[in-house]
Amino acid sequence: MSKVIGIDLGTTNSCVAIMDGSQPRVIENAEGARTTPSIVAFTDEERLVGQPAKRQAVTNPDNTIFGVKRLIGRRFDDSDLAKDKKNLPFAVINGGNGDAWVEAKSEKYSPSQISAFILGKMKETAESYLGEEVTQAVITVPAYFNDAQRQATKDAGKIAGLEVLRIINEPTAAALAYGLDKAETQTIAVYDLGGGTFDVTILEIDDGLFEVKSTNGDTFLGGEDFDMRIVNYLADEFKKEHGVDLTKDKMALQRLKEAAEKAKIELSSSSQTEINQPFISMDPSSGQPLHLVIKLTRAKLESLVGDLIKNSMKPCAAALKDAGLSASDIDEVVLVGGMTRMPKVIEEVTKFFGKEPHKGVNPDEVVAMGAAIQAGVLQGDVKDVVLLDVTPLSLGIETLGGVFTRLIDRNTTIPTKKSQVFSTAEDNQNAVTIRVFQGEREMAADNKMLGQFNLEDIPPAPRGMPQIEVTFDIDANGIVSVSAKDKGTGKEQKITIQASGGLSDEDIEKMVKDAEDNAEADKERRELIEARNQAESLIHSTEKSIEDHGDKVDPSTIEAIELAIAALKDDLEGDKANAEKIKSGIQNVTEAAMRLGEAIYKAQAEEGGADEPSAADEDASAGPGDDDIVDAEFEDLDDNKR
């Protein structure tokens, strides 16, 4: 049975881990890094994922997609998304189904597809390490993700060729990694401030039992927002000095974003940094190049982002209230996410909870490690661990007057099932429409609509008489199913909620096929690159041999080799390059080069040079007068023995 892997699908970076014996292990990617940038880029020739995509972002801003986790499961007209769109160098479009999609190289991609490319990279990383195919995974999501976002993440896994055994909340995963070997009873708070989202979760850990008491958060608060504060500050300062608006230039905007991220990281360990971006623009009047050189202090950064940090404290207070606890009841605060390295964040968390946060976990890797532990639990490799999570938001339906009637309250332990009986609003009503919502507002329209369905053929009856039983069922992934049953006739209608505009089964199947086709194309491209490298190396070494020893060989042999090399060079040219053709050309040059070697040795033998070392022998031999390397080494050893 192949390993089940744990994946932290992050806004900024992603990470993959497995259970290695009794402990989770983070796997390094092909570039040797333990985390992979959650970036996908499209060029004329290929699709890039991770560090290669990040490296070319400045020169290809229109087609480099980042931070897609903030788009997943969201509508195009989402109010939170509106403020982000203007700061993104790539196009966010209406996917036709009302969802926010992205566009690159004139192709439309759903956020689930882009996420699938990142998950595919994580899958490849694990397969390369394990030496076997991986088909199953546990994937993490922010605790405050709604049903649509969870379903879209699960869809991404399917598109990537993974069976998603479990969707697990990121803070809960972090708690698993933190508390795996802890036997004592503890109440902990996990403060998770990542690249794009914020969560806080209160858990009780008791000898292998991990019980979530409450969770809260903001799916549009994270490091990306901190970066944009710096970007806007830099752009404003530059505009004051030079009168040029850098935010209108996509390439300059991408350079500012990279510089902002770098400066933010540097200011976690130093009090001041210099942001230096030469030739970032041009003076419109003189045509002279303009350079951006700005000093940024830690104090200035803290003033720019102070309200963002303060905003993260509101969910902390709400989570404590929902759990029925005070800050003094928390035994340990666990920090998760790269933003928790910022000194001001640590200071505010310490002030709020009244204690120094725990620093024994790696905030970038702990979530993936927790996902691997959950994978181990599902696979049976990890014993005596029980995880009880909660639903982050209340679930209910719209009733008469547009009121939101809750069936399942937030922070209810999942999986769970709840039923309630409703009736008709009019006489002789023969159908009801069940509209399902998720949220905390009193009016249904103010909450997130997850979907709707109809229960038809209700027998005519006075209003209030029919008995319609509505049942909500939330599975361990936090994904919702809803059914409605007419108790009089037994007629039932049931759906697994698919957000209006979410991907249909047909969409997913098409994307799975596209991913498989791309995987084959990627494999062919890799084979072509490897064949090209081998061919170029062979051409170089063979031409050098001709240059060094060509005078020892008859012209017809040299001519045959040069013809083979010319044919191989022709095979390497431009668009017509083909791996199989190149391999055939490599074979032809190799065979021709063998004749060169034979001719060289034959010429040496005829000249009586077989007893004398060749140039290659002189380089390798231990001294003059030795017939070959083996004898020379043997004689040296023999001398040493004496």
Curated annotation (Swiss-Prot):
MF annotations from Gene Ontology: ATP binding; ATP-dependent protein folding chaperone; unfolded protein binding
Gene3D superfamilies: 1.20.1270.10, 3.30.420.40, Actin, Chain A, domain 4, Substrate Binding Domain Of DNAk, Chain A, domain 1
Region (Disordered): 603-642
Classification via InterPro entries: ATPase_NBD (IPR043129), Chaperone_DnaK (IPR012725), Heat_shock_70_CS (IPR018181), HSP70_C_sf (IPR029048), HSP70_peptide-bd_sf (IPR029047), Hsp_70_fam (IPR013126)
Biased composition regions of type Acidic residues, renumbered to the chain: 608-642
Keywords in alphabetical order: ATP-binding, Chaperone, Nucleotide-binding, Phosphoprotein, Stress response
Family that this chain belongs to: Belongs to the heat shock protein 70 family.
Protein function: Acts as a chaperone.
PANTHER family per UniProt: HEAT SHOCK PROTEIN 70KDA
Name by which UniProt lists this protein: Chaperone protein DnaK
Organism field: Ruegeria sp. (strain TM1040) (Silicibacter sp.)
Name of the gene this protein is made from: dnaK
